[in-house]
Regions:
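ATP-binding glycine-rich phosphate-binding loop
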Residues: 32-69, 74-78, 104
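The N-lobe alphaC helix and its flanking beta3-alphaC-beta4 segment of protein kinase-like domains
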Residues: 77-105
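Catalytic-loop of the protein kinase fold
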Residues: 165, 169-187
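Conserved catalytic-loop aspartate of Hanks-type protein kinases
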Residues: 238
Length: 248
């Protein structure tokens, strides 16, 4: 199933409803931490205080920034930095230098973040608001979090998702891991924001960065039984994953 088929399908439903610094290879240490606050620095050694930990995953943790409600910081776990440096920093730096056209709808890296020793430990990003798309796919949570949504509203949300994925594809950026928790829906505007973008497969000026994560149940047959970090996604394999979540 390609883009034309997906758009035709949703347009049909919609119409029916309308009528009815350089990488440093040495291991990085943790950010300066006192009690429950963490201090990090930009490339010019300007400090910023982090507050509440909002999320924690296998690669790192996401924190709020004191005095900046619109910005979040992701700090990678020390063991991740020790294992993946300098490649990880190279990828984030490439993303910083190649912002997509729809960066305003993405938690795309804004600046590099360092510890007190000026070792790279993560990045800052815009904070996106919305409800997880997982709620919209859940029969019970859907009614709780989207009580006024009808089928036409759902179609508008999914069309927003499709259009943004297609825009990224035109820029050689593949989502890779179609986790519904990484898409946030604004119930009012019916638009989708993307978070956890640092795992995306990207290609910038001849540099290729794979997406090292994914879900087997959303992976096309030709990519099964392979390490995700060795898989090269393309628009066809992406549409396979996208089609599955559209009908969840």
């Amino acid at each position: 199933m390609m883009w034309g088929s997906l758009f035709n399908l949703f347009n049909t439903v919609n119409a029916a409803q309308a009528t009815s610094p350089k990488p440093q290879p040495r291991p990085a240490q943790s950010a300066s931490q006192t009690m429950q606050t963490i201090t990090v620095y930009d490339a010019h050694k300007n400090p910023k205080t982090l507050e509440n930990m909002l999320a924690k995953g296998g690669e790192g943790s996401v924190y709020a920034v004191q005095g900046r409600s619109d910005v979040l910081v992701k700090l990678y776990h020390p063991e991740v930095l020790n294992k993946l440096q300098p490649h990880l920093q190279q990828k984030i730096t490439a993303m910083l230098n190649n912002k997509p056209n729809t960066a305003n709808l993405l938690s795309w890296p804004l600046i590099d973040v360092y510890n007190q020793q000026q070792q790279w430990i993560g990045y800052a990003m815009h904070r996106k608001q919305g409800l997880k798309l997982q709620f919209l796919a859940h029969a019970v949570l859907y009614k709780k979090h989207f009580p006024h949504f009808n089928r036409r509203d759902i179609v508008l949300v999914l069309l927003s998702l499709i259009e943004q994925v297609q825009s990224l594809h035109r820029q050689q950026i593949m989502i890779g891991d179609y986790n519904l928790n990484n898409f946030l829906c604004d119930p009012k505007s019916k638009t989708i924001s993307f978070i956890d973008c640092d795992s995306y497969q990207c290609q910038f000026n001849g540099q290729f960065f794979a997406c090292p994560v994914g879900s087997p149940d959303l992976t096309p047959p030709e990519h099964q039984n392979k390490s995700f970090k060795e898989v090269v996604r393309n628009s066809q394999s992406e549409v396979f994953s996208l089609a599955i979540i559209l009908f969840k």
